């Protein structure tokens, strides 16, 4: 069995990857999108340069993610004469681009180690579950109970993941989970509802024009701040950037002169409380990483505002896209055609000015969490 890590692989792998992926000039900002097929091709070339054994076949590439839900690499298996014969882990966070590899009849990759040792706590869908890199050489899968099982035999709380990180660019696929008000009137009957007396919004073009910045969580909190009379309408830019700073929002990209930001969910509630305190407004917060519908309706019913954070798999990129929105009401709807009931949150979506209805029952959320305020 051969097992080595990091340094010895650097030269070999650089030569391997250069033979597969074209090298761009430094001023070219193009990003190579590594596909399953390319991961297999990379793995096979790597194996041929290391093992010098014929008939090794790479297969079953499995994408893995960092703790924020961003794809960072692949685990690829090897077969020799139709029998398992090791694996390689490509990891873009490692300098060598390979974090580990192993060849041999008894080599099990991190995913297999977890699933084989803890099979009784995983659902039937576990074989398609996402695997997360928790630490160097440690990986985890979320089990039936919402716990993370790792290849080191540890059981961790799901809160070690920050999958709810909110990113501030508008993916087109959000139209699938957000209903416009005219669509609601046309296709649904209202079962029950409650909402704040005033709908507050600051559309994205306006925010970008006055601040040169945009982050969905910051825009959502600006609406919350306005609701609690903590916003100075003569200095929207100043308040926006104060919220940006108090929540630890970081730059995720820049485009067209606009700086886009990313905010970790765990910072949103406390950061907003600090912002309000600076305005002599007393507000408390509660963040739930697995809220039910009542978590939001109870907040609205007592006359407070909330922020919903959710993630989907973008049909454009195949990757998770996250978004945070101010929840200013709720509505249970019944579809005219099917009679199905839909639970929605009435949200300021961060992009436009009008209320939209977020389908809380959407069955393909990658994650959904919330922050409620009391003030």
Q: Which residues does each predicted region cover?
A:
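Long, charged/polar, surface-exposed segments that mediate recognition or autoinhibition
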Residues: 33, 78, 82-124, 295
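Short beta-strand elements that form the blades of beta-propeller/WD-repeat-like
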Residues: 72-79, 138-143
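Predominantly the structural core of cysteine protease catalytic domains
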Residues: 223, 251-333, 337-340
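Active-site-adjacent structural segments surrounding the nucleophilic cysteine of cysteine proteases
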Residues: 40, 44-59, 64, 104-131, ...
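Active-site signature of cysteine proteases
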Residues: 124-127, 132-133, 144, 292-294, ...
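Short, hydrophobic/aromatic-rich segments at coil-to-beta transitions
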Residues: 69-76, 300-308, 342-346
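Sec-dependent signal peptide cleavage junction
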Residues: 17-31
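Bacterial N-terminal signal peptides
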Residues: 8-19
């Amino acid at each position: 069995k051969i097992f080595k890590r990091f340094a010895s692989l650097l030269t070999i792998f650089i030569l391997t990857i250069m033979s597969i992926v074209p090298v761009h000039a430094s001023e070219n900002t193009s990003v190579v999108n590594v596909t399953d097929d390319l991961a297999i091709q990379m793995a096979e070339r790597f194996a041929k340069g290391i093992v010098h054994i014929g008939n090794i076949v790479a297969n079953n590439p499995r994408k893995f993610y960092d703790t924020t839900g961003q794809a960072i690499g692949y685990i690829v298996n090897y077969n020799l004469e139709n029998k398992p014969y090791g694996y390689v882990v490509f990891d873009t966070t490692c300098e060598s681009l390979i974090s580990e590899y192993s060849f041999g009849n008894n080599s099990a990759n991190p995913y297999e180690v977890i699933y084989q040792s803890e099979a009784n706590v995983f659902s039937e869908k576990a074989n398609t579950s996402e695997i997360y890199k928790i630490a160097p050489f440690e990986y985890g899968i979320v089990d039936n109970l919402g716990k993370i099982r790792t290849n080191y035999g540890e059981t961790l709380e799901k809160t070690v993941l920050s999958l709810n990180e909110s990113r501030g660019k508008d993916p087109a696929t959000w139209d699938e989970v957000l209903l416009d008000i005219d669509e609601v009137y046309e296709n649904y009957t209202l079962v029950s509802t409650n909402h704040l007396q005033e709908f507050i919004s600051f559309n994205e073009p306006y925010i970008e024009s006055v601040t040169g910045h945009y982050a969905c969580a910051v825009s959502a909190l600006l609406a919350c701040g306005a609701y609690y009379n903590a916003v100075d309408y003569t200095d929207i830019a100043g308040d926006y950037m104060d919220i940006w700073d108090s929540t630890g929002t970081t730059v995720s990209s820049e485009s067209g002169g606009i700086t886009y930001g990313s905010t970790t969910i765990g910072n949103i509630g406390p950061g907003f409380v600090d912002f309000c305190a600076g305005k002599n407004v007393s507000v408390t917060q509660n963040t739930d990483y697995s809220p039910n519908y009542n978590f939001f309706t109870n907040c609205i019913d007592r006359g407070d505002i909330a922020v919903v954070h959710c993630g989907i798999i973008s049909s454009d990129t195949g990757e998770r896209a996250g978004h945070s929105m101010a929840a200013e009401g709720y509505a249970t709807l019944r579809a005219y055609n099917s009679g199905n009931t839909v639970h929605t949150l009435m949200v300021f979506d961060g992009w436009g000015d009008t209320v939209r209805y977020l389908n809380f029952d959407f069955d393909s959320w990658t994650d959904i969490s919330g922050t409620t305020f009391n003030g």
